[in-house]
Protein backbone atom coordinates (compact mmCIF):
# COMPACT_ATOMS: atom_id res chain seq x y z
CA UNK A 1 0.00 0.00 0.00
CA UNK A 2 1.60 3.25 -1.14
CA UNK A 3 1.78 6.38 1.01
CA UNK A 4 1.07 9.66 -0.76
CA UNK A 5 3.43 12.62 -0.68
CA UNK A 6 0.88 14.56 1.39
CA UNK A 7 0.65 11.74 3.92
CA UNK A 8 4.45 11.56 4.16
CA UNK A 9 4.62 15.30 4.77
CA UNK A 10 1.91 15.12 7.43
CA UNK A 11 3.69 12.23 9.12
CA UNK A 12 6.95 14.19 9.21
CA UNK A 13 5.20 17.16 10.82
CA UNK A 14 3.52 14.93 13.41
CA UNK A 15 6.78 13.16 14.26
CA UNK A 16 8.52 16.50 14.70
CA UNK A 17 5.72 17.84 16.89
CA UNK A 18 5.56 14.75 19.08
CA UNK A 19 9.36 14.65 19.40
CA UNK A 20 9.36 18.28 20.53
CA UNK A 21 6.64 17.69 23.13
CA UNK A 22 8.43 14.55 24.31
CA UNK A 23 11.70 16.43 24.83
CA UNK A 24 9.99 19.32 26.61
CA UNK A 25 8.03 16.93 28.81
CA UNK A 26 11.19 15.02 29.66
CA UNK A 27 12.98 18.22 30.63
CA UNK A 28 10.11 19.39 32.83
CA UNK A 29 9.90 15.96 34.46
CA UNK A 30 13.59 15.93 35.38
CA UNK A 31 13.96 15.74 39.17
CA UNK A 32 16.37 18.68 39.25
CA UNK A 33 13.81 20.91 37.52
CA UNK A 34 10.63 19.66 39.13
CA UNK A 35 11.25 21.93 42.14
CA UNK A 36 9.73 24.73 40.06
CA UNK A 37 6.29 23.26 40.70
CA UNK A 38 6.67 23.20 44.48
CA UNK A 39 4.99 25.81 46.65
CA UNK A 40 5.12 26.84 50.27
CA UNK A 41 1.42 27.71 50.17
CA UNK A 42 -1.01 24.96 51.14
CA UNK A 43 -4.35 25.08 49.34
CA UNK A 44 -7.58 23.78 50.82
CA UNK A 45 -10.14 21.42 49.33
CA UNK A 46 -13.56 22.98 48.88
CA UNK A 47 -15.50 20.14 47.30
CA UNK A 48 -14.97 16.64 45.92
CA UNK A 49 -16.24 15.31 42.58
CA UNK A 50 -18.42 12.23 42.41
CA UNK A 51 -16.80 9.01 41.23
CA UNK A 52 -19.19 7.16 38.92
CA UNK A 53 -16.98 4.11 38.45
CA UNK A 54 -17.98 0.85 40.14
CA UNK A 55 -16.11 -0.09 43.31
CA UNK A 56 -15.57 -3.56 44.79
CA UNK A 57 -15.17 -3.64 48.56
CA UNK A 58 -13.73 -7.17 48.48
CA UNK A 59 -10.63 -5.79 46.73
CA UNK A 60 -9.81 -3.72 49.82
CA UNK A 61 -8.75 -6.75 51.87
CA UNK A 62 -6.39 -7.87 49.08
CA UNK A 63 -4.73 -4.47 48.97
CA UNK A 64 -4.45 -4.37 52.76
CA UNK A 65 -2.72 -7.77 52.62
CA UNK A 66 -0.20 -6.41 50.10
CA UNK A 67 -1.66 -8.30 47.15
CA UNK A 68 -1.99 -5.96 44.18
CA UNK A 69 -3.92 -7.66 41.35
CA UNK A 70 -4.15 -5.26 38.42
CA UNK A 71 -4.51 -5.79 34.67
CA UNK A 72 -4.26 -9.56 34.90
CA UNK A 73 -1.02 -9.51 36.91
CA UNK A 74 -0.51 -10.08 40.65
CA UNK A 75 2.28 -8.62 42.76
CA UNK A 76 2.65 -9.68 46.39
CA UNK A 77 4.61 -6.99 48.19
CA UNK A 78 5.59 -8.93 51.33
CA UNK A 79 5.78 -5.79 53.51
CA UNK A 80 7.48 -3.74 50.82
CA UNK A 81 5.94 -0.71 49.16
CA UNK A 82 4.19 -1.54 45.87
CA UNK A 83 5.84 1.57 44.44
CA UNK A 84 9.25 -0.03 44.95
CA UNK A 85 8.33 -3.26 43.16
CA UNK A 86 9.27 -4.00 39.57
CA UNK A 87 6.04 -3.75 37.55
CA UNK A 88 5.15 -7.02 35.76
CA UNK A 89 3.60 -5.04 32.88
CA UNK A 90 3.03 -1.46 31.76
CA UNK A 91 -0.72 -1.89 32.29
CA UNK A 92 -0.13 -2.96 35.90
CA UNK A 93 2.10 0.07 36.51
CA UNK A 94 -0.43 2.47 35.00
CA UNK A 95 -3.19 1.09 37.23
CA UNK A 96 -1.03 1.29 40.36
CA UNK A 97 0.32 4.79 39.74
CA UNK A 98 -3.03 6.29 38.70
CA UNK A 99 -4.63 5.28 42.05
CA UNK A 100 -7.88 4.19 40.39
CA UNK A 101 -8.01 1.41 43.00
CA UNK A 102 -8.66 3.91 45.82
CA UNK A 103 -12.38 3.54 45.14
CA UNK A 104 -12.24 -0.09 46.27
CA UNK A 105 -10.84 1.02 49.64
CA UNK A 106 -13.56 3.66 49.87
CA UNK A 107 -16.22 1.02 49.21
CA UNK A 108 -15.08 -0.88 52.32
CA UNK A 109 -15.05 2.43 54.26
CA UNK A 110 -13.52 1.49 57.59
CA UNK A 111 -10.85 2.98 59.81
CA UNK A 112 -8.45 0.29 58.57
CA UNK A 113 -9.02 1.00 54.87
CA UNK A 114 -8.72 4.76 55.44
CA UNK A 115 -5.44 4.23 57.25
CA UNK A 116 -4.29 1.88 54.48
CA UNK A 117 -5.15 4.49 51.83
CA UNK A 118 -3.19 7.18 53.67
CA UNK A 119 -0.19 4.88 54.10
CA UNK A 120 -0.10 4.06 50.40
CA UNK A 121 -0.42 7.71 49.41
CA UNK A 122 2.39 8.55 51.84
CA UNK A 123 4.53 5.84 50.26
CA UNK A 124 3.93 7.21 46.78
CA UNK A 125 4.88 10.71 47.90
CA UNK A 126 8.09 9.34 49.44
CA UNK A 127 9.05 7.05 46.56
CA UNK A 128 7.50 8.57 43.44
CA UNK A 129 6.43 12.07 44.34
CA UNK A 130 9.88 13.56 44.64
CA UNK A 131 12.54 12.03 42.44
CA UNK A 132 11.09 9.17 40.41
CA UNK A 133 9.61 10.29 37.08
CA UNK A 134 7.65 7.15 36.16
CA UNK A 135 4.49 8.39 37.86
CA UNK A 136 4.55 11.78 36.16
CA UNK A 137 3.46 10.72 32.69
CA UNK A 138 0.63 13.06 31.78
CA UNK A 139 -2.10 10.45 31.28
CA UNK A 140 -1.21 8.77 34.61
CA UNK A 141 -0.92 12.12 36.37
CA UNK A 142 -4.32 13.30 35.10
CA UNK A 143 -6.09 10.18 36.34
CA UNK A 144 -4.30 10.31 39.71
CA UNK A 145 -5.38 13.92 40.27
CA UNK A 146 -8.99 13.01 39.51
CA UNK A 147 -8.82 9.98 41.82
CA UNK A 148 -7.21 11.87 44.69
CA UNK A 149 -9.83 14.62 44.44
CA UNK A 150 -12.71 12.13 44.17
CA UNK A 151 -11.58 10.06 47.14
CA UNK A 152 -10.36 12.98 49.29
CA UNK A 153 -13.32 12.89 51.75
CA UNK A 154 -12.62 9.23 52.42
CA UNK A 155 -8.83 9.60 52.59
CA UNK A 156 -8.83 12.72 54.79
CA UNK A 157 -11.45 11.56 57.27
CA UNK A 158 -9.71 11.20 60.67
CA UNK A 159 -6.39 12.26 59.10
CA UNK A 160 -3.97 14.28 61.23
CA UNK A 161 -2.85 17.76 60.27
CA UNK A 162 0.54 16.54 59.05
CA UNK A 163 -0.93 14.14 56.49
CA UNK A 164 -3.51 16.72 55.40
CA UNK A 165 -0.78 19.26 54.62
CA UNK A 166 1.37 16.64 52.94
CA UNK A 167 -1.53 15.40 50.81
CA UNK A 168 -2.63 18.87 49.71
CA UNK A 169 0.94 20.01 49.04
CA UNK A 170 1.60 17.01 46.80
CA UNK A 171 -1.74 17.42 45.03
CA UNK A 172 -1.07 21.11 44.41
CA UNK A 173 2.35 20.31 43.01
CA UNK A 174 0.89 17.72 40.63
CA UNK A 175 -1.76 20.18 39.44
CA UNK A 176 0.84 22.85 38.74
CA UNK A 177 2.94 20.35 36.81
CA UNK A 178 -0.08 19.25 34.78
CA UNK A 179 -1.07 22.83 34.03
CA UNK A 180 2.38 23.45 32.57
CA UNK A 181 2.62 20.20 30.59
CA UNK A 182 -0.93 19.17 29.59
CA UNK A 183 -0.27 19.92 25.93
CA UNK A 184 2.76 17.62 25.91
CA UNK A 185 0.59 14.52 26.06
CA UNK A 186 -0.62 12.90 22.85
CA UNK A 187 -3.65 14.16 21.00
CA UNK A 188 -7.07 12.68 21.57
CA UNK A 189 -8.65 11.40 24.74
CA UNK A 190 -5.45 11.62 26.90
CA UNK A 191 -5.18 15.36 26.23
CA UNK A 192 -8.88 15.93 26.87
CA UNK A 193 -8.67 14.00 30.14
CA UNK A 194 -5.70 16.15 31.20
CA UNK A 195 -7.73 19.31 30.63
CA UNK A 196 -10.71 17.78 32.47
CA UNK A 197 -8.41 17.04 35.43
CA UNK A 198 -7.28 20.69 35.46
CA UNK A 199 -10.90 21.83 35.58
CA UNK A 200 -11.61 19.40 38.42
CA UNK A 201 -8.71 20.92 40.38
CA UNK A 202 -9.78 24.49 39.61
CA UNK A 203 -13.27 23.87 40.99
CA UNK A 204 -12.26 21.69 43.95
CA UNK A 205 -9.23 23.47 45.38
CA UNK A 206 -8.95 26.85 47.04
CA UNK A 207 -6.63 29.31 45.37
CA UNK A 208 -7.26 28.01 41.84
CA UNK A 209 -9.98 30.43 40.76
CA UNK A 210 -7.51 32.54 38.80
CA UNK A 211 -7.04 29.63 36.40
CA UNK A 212 -10.74 28.98 35.85
CA UNK A 213 -11.20 31.07 32.71
CA UNK A 214 -8.13 29.66 30.99
CA UNK A 215 -8.93 26.05 31.89
CA UNK A 216 -12.54 26.42 30.75
CA UNK A 217 -11.37 27.91 27.46
CA UNK A 218 -9.03 24.94 26.90
CA UNK A 219 -11.88 22.57 27.76
CA UNK A 220 -14.22 24.21 25.25
CA UNK A 221 -11.61 24.09 22.49
CA UNK A 222 -10.78 20.44 23.09
CA UNK A 223 -14.43 19.36 23.32
CA UNK A 224 -15.18 21.06 20.01
CA UNK A 225 -12.16 19.37 18.47
CA UNK A 226 -12.84 15.87 19.77
CA UNK A 227 -16.62 15.44 20.12
CA UNK A 228 -18.09 15.17 16.64
CA UNK A 229 -21.46 16.70 15.65
CA UNK A 230 -23.20 13.30 15.82
CA UNK A 231 -21.75 12.59 19.29
CA UNK A 232 -18.94 10.24 18.34
CA UNK A 233 -15.32 10.68 19.35
CA UNK A 234 -12.75 11.77 16.80
CA UNK A 235 -10.68 8.61 17.48
CA UNK A 236 -13.67 6.53 16.26
CA UNK A 237 -13.34 4.35 19.38
CA UNK A 238 -16.88 3.90 20.78
CA UNK A 239 -15.47 2.89 24.17
CA UNK A 240 -13.97 6.37 24.57
CA UNK A 241 -17.50 7.74 24.94
CA UNK A 242 -18.15 5.81 28.16
CA UNK A 243 -14.90 6.99 29.74
CA UNK A 244 -15.51 10.53 28.57
CA UNK A 245 -19.00 10.79 30.06
CA UNK A 246 -17.79 9.23 33.32
CA UNK A 247 -15.56 12.31 33.67
CA UNK A 248 -17.77 14.98 32.08
CA UNK A 249 -20.91 14.28 34.14
CA UNK A 250 -19.18 14.86 37.52
CA UNK A 251 -17.49 17.94 36.04
CA UNK A 252 -20.87 19.43 35.18
CA UNK A 253 -22.03 18.68 38.72
CA UNK A 254 -18.98 20.52 40.10
CA UNK A 255 -19.89 23.68 38.21
CA UNK A 256 -23.41 23.55 39.62
CA UNK A 257 -22.18 22.81 43.15
CA UNK A 258 -19.92 25.88 42.97
CA UNK A 259 -22.93 27.89 41.72
CA UNK A 260 -21.29 28.43 38.36
CA UNK A 261 -22.93 28.06 34.97
CA UNK A 262 -21.45 25.04 33.15
CA UNK A 263 -19.97 25.98 29.77
CA UNK A 264 -22.48 25.48 26.99
CA UNK A 265 -19.91 23.42 25.10
CA UNK A 266 -19.83 21.00 28.04
CA UNK A 267 -23.62 20.64 28.06
CA UNK A 268 -23.66 20.24 24.29
CA UNK A 269 -20.98 17.55 24.37
CA UNK A 270 -22.86 15.54 26.99
CA UNK A 271 -26.14 15.90 25.10
CA UNK A 272 -24.54 14.71 21.86
CA UNK A 273 -22.57 11.82 23.33
CA UNK A 274 -25.38 10.32 25.42
CA UNK A 275 -27.52 9.03 22.49
CA UNK A 276 -24.43 7.46 20.93
CA UNK A 277 -24.15 5.11 23.92
CA UNK A 278 -27.44 3.57 22.83
CA UNK A 279 -26.34 3.65 19.19
CA UNK A 280 -23.41 1.28 19.83
CA UNK A 281 -25.26 -1.13 22.18
CA UNK A 282 -26.44 -4.57 21.17
CA UNK A 283 -29.49 -6.26 22.64
CA UNK A 284 -27.40 -7.79 25.43
CA UNK A 285 -26.19 -4.35 26.53
CA UNK A 286 -22.65 -4.73 25.20
CA UNK A 287 -20.92 -2.38 22.79
CA UNK A 288 -20.08 -3.35 19.24
CA UNK A 289 -16.39 -4.22 18.76
CA UNK A 290 -15.12 -1.42 16.56
CA UNK A 291 -11.82 0.47 16.60
CA UNK A 292 -10.35 -0.50 19.95
CA UNK A 293 -13.40 -1.50 21.99
CA UNK A 294 -12.78 -4.24 24.54
CA UNK A 295 -15.13 -5.78 27.12
CA UNK A 296 -17.93 -3.34 27.87
CA UNK A 297 -17.91 -1.94 31.45
CA UNK A 298 -21.62 -2.68 31.78
CA UNK A 299 -21.89 -1.33 35.34
CA UNK A 300 -20.35 2.00 34.39
CA UNK A 301 -22.41 2.14 31.20
CA UNK A 302 -25.62 1.61 33.19
CA UNK A 303 -24.59 4.32 35.67
CA UNK A 304 -23.86 6.81 32.91
CA UNK A 305 -27.08 6.00 31.04
CA UNK A 306 -29.05 6.75 34.21
CA UNK A 307 -28.24 10.42 33.52
CA UNK A 308 -29.93 10.24 30.12
CA UNK A 309 -33.27 11.97 30.53
CA UNK A 310 -34.41 11.42 26.93
CA UNK A 311 -33.98 7.62 26.85
CA UNK A 312 -35.02 7.65 23.22
CA UNK A 313 -34.49 5.27 20.35
CA UNK A 314 -30.86 5.39 19.18
CA UNK A 315 -30.10 7.28 16.01
CA UNK A 316 -29.43 5.17 12.94
CA UNK A 317 -27.04 7.36 10.98
CA UNK A 318 -23.76 8.67 12.40
CA UNK A 319 -22.03 10.06 9.30
CA UNK A 320 -19.42 12.13 11.13
CA UNK A 321 -18.31 9.16 13.25
CA UNK A 322 -18.49 6.81 10.26
CA UNK A 323 -21.05 4.28 11.50
CA UNK A 324 -24.49 3.08 10.46
CA UNK A 325 -27.13 1.20 12.44
CA UNK A 326 -30.22 -0.73 11.33
CA UNK A 327 -32.92 -1.84 13.78
CA UNK A 328 -35.67 -4.15 12.58
CA UNK A 329 -37.86 -6.35 14.73
CA UNK A 330 -35.61 -7.76 17.44
CA UNK A 331 -32.46 -7.53 15.30
CA UNK A 332 -29.79 -4.84 15.24
CA UNK A 333 -26.96 -4.38 12.75
CA UNK A 334 -24.05 -1.94 13.08
CA UNK A 335 -21.54 -1.24 10.31
CA UNK A 336 -18.23 0.62 10.16
CA UNK A 337 -18.58 3.00 7.22
CA UNK A 338 -15.82 5.49 7.92
CA UNK A 339 -12.18 6.13 6.98
CA UNK A 340 -9.45 5.93 9.63
CA UNK A 341 -9.31 8.82 12.12
CA UNK A 342 -6.65 11.52 11.80
CA UNK A 343 -3.16 10.04 11.94
CA UNK A 344 -2.34 11.60 15.31
CA UNK A 345 -5.40 9.95 16.88
CA UNK A 346 -5.26 6.58 15.12
CA UNK A 347 -3.16 4.61 17.63
CA UNK A 348 -6.13 2.39 18.53
CA UNK A 349 -8.03 2.46 15.24
CA UNK A 350 -8.60 -0.77 13.30
CA UNK A 351 -8.56 -1.71 9.62
CA UNK A 352 -12.19 -2.81 9.70
CA UNK A 353 -13.89 -0.70 7.06
CA UNK A 354 -17.32 -2.13 6.06
CA UNK A 355 -17.20 -4.71 8.86
CA UNK A 356 -20.51 -5.27 10.62
CA UNK A 357 -21.92 -6.80 13.77
CA UNK A 358 -25.40 -8.26 14.17
CA UNK A 359 -27.47 -9.23 17.20
CA UNK A 360 -30.83 -10.92 17.68
CA UNK A 361 -32.71 -10.30 20.93
CA UNK A 362 -30.09 -10.80 23.66
CA UNK A 363 -27.70 -12.72 21.43
CA UNK A 364 -24.79 -11.41 19.40
CA UNK A 365 -24.42 -13.41 16.18
CA UNK A 366 -21.78 -11.77 13.98
CA UNK A 367 -18.99 -9.86 15.72
CA UNK A 368 -15.50 -8.49 15.27
CA UNK A 369 -12.71 -9.93 17.40
CA UNK A 370 -12.30 -6.81 19.56
CA UNK A 371 -9.57 -6.35 22.18
CA UNK A 372 -9.07 -8.04 25.56
CA UNK A 373 -9.31 -6.14 28.83
CA UNK A 374 -5.71 -7.01 29.77
CA UNK A 375 -2.55 -7.88 27.84
CA UNK A 376 -3.76 -5.70 25.00
CA UNK A 377 -0.32 -5.21 23.53
CA UNK A 378 0.06 -8.96 22.99
CA UNK A 379 -3.03 -8.97 20.78
CA UNK A 380 -3.25 -5.44 19.40
CA UNK A 381 -1.44 -6.05 16.09
CA UNK A 382 -3.62 -9.07 15.29
CA UNK A 383 -6.84 -7.43 16.51
CA UNK A 384 -6.34 -4.30 14.40
CA UNK A 385 -5.78 -6.20 11.14
CA UNK A 386 -8.61 -6.59 8.64
CA UNK A 387 -8.88 -10.42 9.01
CA UNK A 388 -9.98 -9.88 12.64
CA UNK A 389 -13.15 -8.20 11.36
CA UNK A 390 -16.33 -9.38 9.70
CA UNK A 391 -15.54 -7.87 6.34
CA UNK A 392 -13.57 -8.60 3.15
CA UNK A 393 -9.81 -9.13 3.08
CA UNK A 394 -7.91 -9.01 -0.22
CA UNK A 395 -4.65 -10.93 -0.69
CA UNK A 396 -4.52 -11.48 3.08
CA UNK A 397 -3.66 -7.80 3.61
CA UNK A 398 -5.23 -5.13 5.75
CA UNK A 399 -7.11 -2.25 4.17
CA UNK A 400 -4.96 0.13 6.27
CA UNK A 401 -1.22 0.45 6.65
CA UNK A 402 0.21 0.65 10.17
CA UNK A 403 3.55 2.32 10.88
CA UNK A 404 5.25 -0.49 12.79
CA UNK A 405 8.28 0.96 14.56
CA UNK A 406 9.40 0.81 18.18
CA UNK A 407 10.52 4.43 18.17
CA UNK A 408 7.25 5.58 16.58
CA UNK A 409 5.25 3.50 19.05
CA UNK A 410 7.07 5.12 21.97
CA UNK A 411 6.67 8.57 20.47
CA UNK A 412 2.96 8.28 19.66
CA UNK A 413 1.95 5.94 22.48
CA UNK A 414 0.91 3.36 19.89
CA UNK A 415 1.09 2.45 16.21
CA UNK A 416 -0.61 5.03 13.98
CA UNK A 417 -2.35 4.36 10.68
CA UNK A 418 -0.56 6.15 7.86
CA UNK A 419 -2.80 5.16 4.95
CA UNK A 420 -6.10 3.44 4.33
CA UNK A 421 -9.59 4.03 2.90
CA UNK A 422 -10.19 7.65 2.06
CA UNK A 423 -13.18 7.53 -0.29
CA UNK A 424 -15.92 5.74 1.68
CA UNK A 425 -19.31 6.14 0.03
CA UNK A 426 -22.65 5.34 1.66
CA UNK A 427 -26.19 5.00 0.35
CA UNK A 428 -29.02 4.32 2.76
CA UNK A 429 -32.56 3.32 1.84
CA UNK A 430 -35.10 3.30 4.67
CA UNK A 431 -38.33 2.66 2.79
CA UNK A 432 -39.53 -0.91 3.27
CA UNK A 433 -36.71 -3.17 4.40
CA UNK A 434 -33.75 -1.02 5.56
CA UNK A 435 -30.85 -1.25 3.09
CA UNK A 436 -27.25 -0.04 3.24
CA UNK A 437 -24.78 0.10 0.38
CA UNK A 438 -21.22 1.26 1.08
CA UNK A 439 -17.87 1.10 -0.68
CA UNK A 440 -14.25 1.90 0.13
CA UNK A 441 -11.01 2.34 -1.79
CA UNK A 442 -8.62 0.89 0.78
CA UNK A 443 -7.41 -1.78 -1.65
CA UNK A 444 -7.10 0.37 -4.77
CA UNK A 445 -3.39 1.17 -4.37
CA UNK A 446 -2.39 -2.47 -3.74
CA UNK A 447 -4.93 -4.45 -5.75
CA UNK A 448 -6.75 -1.96 -7.98
CA UNK A 449 -10.05 -3.07 -6.43
CA UNK A 450 -12.95 -1.17 -4.85
CA UNK A 451 -14.95 -3.22 -2.34
CA UNK A 452 -18.69 -2.60 -2.15
CA UNK A 453 -20.95 -4.16 0.48
CA UNK A 454 -24.74 -4.06 0.42
CA UNK A 455 -26.90 -5.35 3.27
CA UNK A 456 -30.67 -5.58 3.54
CA UNK A 457 -32.43 -6.39 6.82
CA UNK A 458 -36.05 -7.52 6.57
CA UNK A 459 -38.69 -5.49 8.36
CA UNK A 460 -39.16 -8.21 11.00
CA UNK A 461 -35.40 -8.60 11.50
CA UNK A 462 -35.48 -12.30 10.65
CA UNK A 463 -33.50 -12.16 7.40
CA UNK A 464 -30.29 -10.40 6.47
CA UNK A 465 -29.29 -10.49 2.81
CA UNK A 466 -25.87 -9.26 1.78
CA UNK A 467 -23.68 -8.85 -1.25
CA UNK A 468 -19.95 -8.15 -1.52
CA UNK A 469 -18.87 -6.98 -4.96
CA UNK A 470 -15.60 -5.91 -6.55
CA UNK A 471 -14.97 -3.33 -9.27
CA UNK A 472 -12.13 -1.24 -10.59
CA UNK A 473 -11.44 2.24 -9.21
CA UNK A 474 -13.50 3.77 -12.02
CA UNK A 475 -16.46 1.51 -11.29
CA UNK A 476 -15.81 -0.66 -14.32
CA UNK A 477 -16.00 -4.47 -14.07
CA UNK A 478 -12.76 -6.24 -13.28
CA UNK A 479 -11.25 -8.47 -15.96
CA UNK A 480 -11.93 -12.18 -15.61
CA UNK A 481 -8.21 -12.80 -15.12
CA UNK A 482 -7.92 -10.44 -12.12
CA UNK A 483 -5.61 -12.08 -9.60
CA UNK A 484 -6.61 -10.56 -6.24
CA UNK A 485 -7.95 -13.24 -3.90
CA UNK A 486 -10.68 -12.42 -1.41
CA UNK A 487 -11.77 -13.84 1.92
CA UNK A 488 -15.19 -12.76 3.22
CA UNK A 489 -15.20 -13.35 6.97
CA UNK A 490 -18.07 -13.57 9.45
CA UNK A 491 -16.72 -14.02 12.98
CA UNK A 492 -19.33 -15.62 15.24
CA UNK A 493 -19.85 -14.90 18.92
CA UNK A 494 -18.47 -17.74 21.09
CA UNK A 495 -21.95 -18.42 22.51
CA UNK A 496 -23.09 -19.55 19.05
CA UNK A 497 -22.79 -23.22 18.10
CA UNK A 498 -22.12 -23.59 14.39
CA UNK A 499 -22.11 -26.59 12.04
CA UNK A 500 -21.86 -26.82 8.26
CA UNK A 501 -24.72 -27.93 6.05
CA UNK A 502 -24.26 -31.11 4.07
CA UNK A 503 -23.99 -29.25 0.75
CA UNK A 504 -21.06 -27.19 2.06
CA UNK A 505 -22.71 -23.91 1.11
CA UNK A 506 -24.30 -23.06 4.41
CA UNK A 507 -23.91 -23.09 8.18
CA UNK A 508 -26.46 -23.72 10.92
CA UNK A 509 -26.19 -21.39 13.95
CA UNK A 510 -27.73 -22.55 17.24
CA UNK A 511 -28.42 -19.95 19.93
CA UNK A 512 -28.77 -20.47 23.68
CA UNK A 513 -32.58 -20.33 23.52
CA UNK A 514 -32.50 -22.95 20.72
CA UNK A 515 -33.30 -20.37 18.08
CA UNK A 516 -31.79 -21.34 14.74
CA UNK A 517 -30.19 -19.12 12.14
CA UNK A 518 -28.95 -20.36 8.78
CA UNK A 519 -26.12 -18.83 6.82
CA UNK A 520 -26.30 -19.54 3.08
CA UNK A 521 -24.41 -18.60 -0.06
CA UNK A 522 -24.04 -19.90 -3.61
CA UNK A 523 -20.25 -19.70 -3.41
CA UNK A 524 -18.41 -23.00 -3.63
CA UNK A 525 -15.59 -22.35 -1.17
CA UNK A 526 -17.27 -21.86 2.23
CA UNK A 527 -15.26 -22.83 5.28
CA UNK A 528 -15.87 -22.93 9.01
CA UNK A 529 -12.55 -22.00 10.63
CA UNK A 530 -11.19 -21.28 14.08
CA UNK A 531 -11.30 -17.74 15.41
CA UNK A 532 -10.94 -15.96 18.74
CA UNK A 533 -13.23 -13.48 20.46
CA UNK A 534 -10.85 -11.25 22.40
CA UNK A 535 -13.38 -9.01 24.13
CA UNK A 536 -14.94 -11.60 26.42
CA UNK A 537 -15.57 -10.48 29.99
CA UNK A 538 -13.58 -13.50 31.15
CA UNK A 539 -10.77 -13.03 28.63
CA UNK A 540 -10.19 -14.28 25.06
CA UNK A 541 -12.46 -17.16 24.03
CA UNK A 542 -12.28 -19.60 21.17
CA UNK A 543 -14.93 -19.29 18.53
CA UNK A 544 -15.38 -19.92 14.79
CA UNK A 545 -15.68 -17.85 11.67
CA UNK A 546 -17.48 -18.44 8.39
CA UNK A 547 -15.14 -17.70 5.49
CA UNK A 548 -15.94 -17.49 1.77
CA UNK A 549 -12.89 -17.70 -0.48
CA UNK A 550 -12.57 -16.69 -4.10
CA UNK A 551 -10.94 -14.50 -6.73
CA UNK A 552 -12.31 -11.01 -7.41
CA UNK A 553 -13.06 -11.57 -11.07
CA UNK A 554 -14.52 -15.05 -10.57
CA UNK A 555 -17.14 -14.05 -9.47
CA UNK A 556 -17.26 -10.26 -9.26
CA UNK A 557 -19.99 -10.42 -6.59
CA UNK A 558 -20.87 -12.86 -3.81
CA UNK A 559 -24.32 -13.03 -2.25
CA UNK A 560 -24.94 -14.41 1.21
CA UNK A 561 -27.70 -14.42 3.80
CA UNK A 562 -28.54 -15.07 7.45
CA UNK A 563 -32.08 -16.34 8.10
CA UNK A 564 -33.88 -17.02 11.35
CA UNK A 565 -35.96 -20.14 11.99
CA UNK A 566 -38.28 -20.50 15.00
CA UNK A 567 -37.03 -22.70 17.86
CA UNK A 568 -36.75 -26.28 16.66
CA UNK A 569 -38.89 -28.98 18.22
CA UNK A 570 -36.95 -31.90 19.73
CA UNK A 571 -35.74 -34.14 16.92
CA UNK A 572 -36.80 -31.71 14.18
CA UNK A 573 -34.47 -31.10 11.25
CA UNK A 574 -33.79 -27.54 10.04
CA UNK A 575 -35.12 -26.40 6.69
CA UNK A 576 -32.74 -26.35 3.78
CA UNK A 577 -31.06 -22.97 3.34
CA UNK A 578 -32.78 -20.57 0.97
CA UNK A 579 -30.98 -18.81 -1.84
CA UNK A 580 -29.84 -15.33 -0.75
CA UNK A 581 -32.01 -12.50 -1.98
CA UNK A 582 -31.02 -8.86 -2.19
CA UNK A 583 -33.82 -6.51 -3.34
CA UNK A 584 -31.56 -3.58 -4.20
Put a short name on every predicted segment.
Residues 1-78:
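Extreme N-terminal leader/anchor segments
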Residues 2, 142, 377-584:
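CBM-like, beta-strand-rich accessory domains located in the C-terminal region of large
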Residues 34-59, 73-107, 187-203:
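Long, acidic, intrinsically disordered low-complexity segments
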Residues 62, 219-220, 274, 318-320, ...:
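Residues that act as N-cap/strand-start positions at coil-to-secondary-structure junctions
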Residues 71, 327-331, 361, 395, ...:
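Short strand-coil-strand connectors
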Residues 90-270:
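Aromatic-lined, polymer-binding surfaces characteristic
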Residues 97, 194, 322, 354, ...:
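Residues that flank catalytic or metal-binding motifs in active/ligand-binding sites
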Residues 228-371, 427:
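Carbohydrate-active enzyme catalytic cores, enriched for enzymes
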Amino acid sequence: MRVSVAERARLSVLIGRRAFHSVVGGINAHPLLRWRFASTKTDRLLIAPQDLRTADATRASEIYAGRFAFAGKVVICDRRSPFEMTPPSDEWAVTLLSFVWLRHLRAADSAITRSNARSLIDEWINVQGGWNSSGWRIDILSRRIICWLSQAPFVLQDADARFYRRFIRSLSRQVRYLRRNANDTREGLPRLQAIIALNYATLCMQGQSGYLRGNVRRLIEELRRQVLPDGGHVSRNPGALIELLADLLPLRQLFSARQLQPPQALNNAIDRVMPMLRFFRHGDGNFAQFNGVGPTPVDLLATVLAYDDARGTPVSNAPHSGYQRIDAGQAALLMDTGPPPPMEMSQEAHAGCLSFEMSWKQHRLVVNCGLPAVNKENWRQVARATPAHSTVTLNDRSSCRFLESLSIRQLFGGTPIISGPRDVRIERESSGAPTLRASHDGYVSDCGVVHTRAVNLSADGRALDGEDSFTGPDGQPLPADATAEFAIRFHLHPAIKASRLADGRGVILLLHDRDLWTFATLADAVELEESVFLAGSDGPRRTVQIVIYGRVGQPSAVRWSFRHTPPAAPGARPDRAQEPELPL
